[in-house]
Amino acid sequence: MSFNSFGRVFRFSTWGESHGPAIGAVVDGCPPGLELSEADIQPWLDKRRPGTSRFTTQRQEPDQVRILSGVFEGRTTGTPISLMIDNVDQRSKDYSEVALAYRPGHADYAYDAKYGFRDHRGGGRSSARETASRVAAGAVARLVIPEVRIRAYLIELGGDRIDPAAFDDAAIDENPFFCPDRAAAARWEAIVDDARKAGSSVGAVVECVAEGVPAGWGAPLYAKLDSELAAACMSINAVKGVEIGDGFAAARLTGETNADPMRPGNDGKPVFLANHAGGIAGGIATGQPVVVRIALKPTSSILTPVETIGRDGKAADIRTKGRHDPCVGIRAAPVLEAMVALVLADQKLLHRAQIG
């Protein structure tokens, strides 16, 4: 199974399965001399960690990271950084039905069609458990781009959207939904509770804003910054759509409305009067905040019986036992931050290599 790596200069690979002994990442291309310890990584993993509220999977994983290589006397050496996270709370017996029949909407059938063999326990490599490795790698990436502030939050859950006028950055860390609208967060409690009680699930939309990205990062045509971000975002489990800036809404605007007018600033740089483009033009950063949005489908593993087929090709019904997120989008916020950080760290080093 190939394609477990991402990036060009700042590159990372993830490894491990949901119910294997451990998962992890190897970060290659990190500059030497950066201060790095487990304490720099753990807070980001704690944001994604399961079992922290009734609104996420009740799988209890401490997600304690260990640095196995690439760091000496508290600093990166420039060699590959190996990160490992033990799996301690697997219940593989809950997946006995999944071994024989495919979960509609999940990767079960597609993996079998391609490889003819799969690890059915918790979804194996296709499980969202893999994203913990990305978050660990993303924490290293943040050290490469200290000038950039990255913040992700949910703007929609189960079809219910936040009120932009009620946006409060301080509220994001006050609720289990990473929601910037306190009233929406209160409504979402009932939406997720109802979905869980019904044995169902709901989707979500997560937005991420990266501030401090310098003008010039990125590239034209086939290596656009927005195409790199889109590829990174689409690699996240359950993501079915990506928008940059206004995204699909831009198709409903006129040229005058969609333009991002500029005025001269006191420092010789432009002052933008709007940011419909999401901080990227021609594949290159403009210096404005980079805005990315992802849409996540409802979790495929549900208790409600669903029509499917077995590995033998015969008709079957399946209801997925085990512990699953009623909304996988909730814990996607720190994962999206990590993927944006990984792309931007790579872009910074690429820009330095190209321009000096």
From Swiss-Prot:
Its job: This reaction introduces a second double bond into the aromatic ring system.
Q: Name one GO cellular component term.
A: cytosol
A GO molecular-function annotation: FMN binding
Q: Subunit composition?
A: Homotetramer.
Q: What is the cofactor note?
A: Reduced FMN (FMNH(2)).
Which keywords appear in this protein's UniProt record, sorted alphabetically? Answer: Amino-acid biosynthesis, Aromatic amino acid biosynthesis, FAD, Flavoprotein, FMN, Lyase, NADP
Class in the EC hierarchy, top level: lyase
Entry EC no(s)? 4.2.3.5
Q: Name one Pfam family in it.
A: Chorismate_synt
Q: Which SUPFAM superfamilies match?
A: Chorismate synthase, AroC
Native organism: Rhizorhabdus wittichii (strain DSM 6014 / CCUG 31198 / JCM 15750 / NBRC 105917 / EY 4224 / RW1) (Sphingomonas wittichii)
Q: Which family does it belong to?
A: Belongs to the chorismate synthase family.
Q: Which CDD domains does the annotation name?
A: Chorismate_synthase (cd07304)
Biochemical pathway = Metabolic intermediate biosynthesis; chorismate biosynthesis; chorismate from D-erythrose 4-phosphate and phosphoenolpyruvate: step 7/7
Official protein name in the record: Chorismate synthase
Any one GO biological process = amino acid biosynthetic process
Q: Which reaction does it catalyse?
A: 5-O-(1-carboxyvinyl)-3-phosphoshikimate = chorismate + phosphate
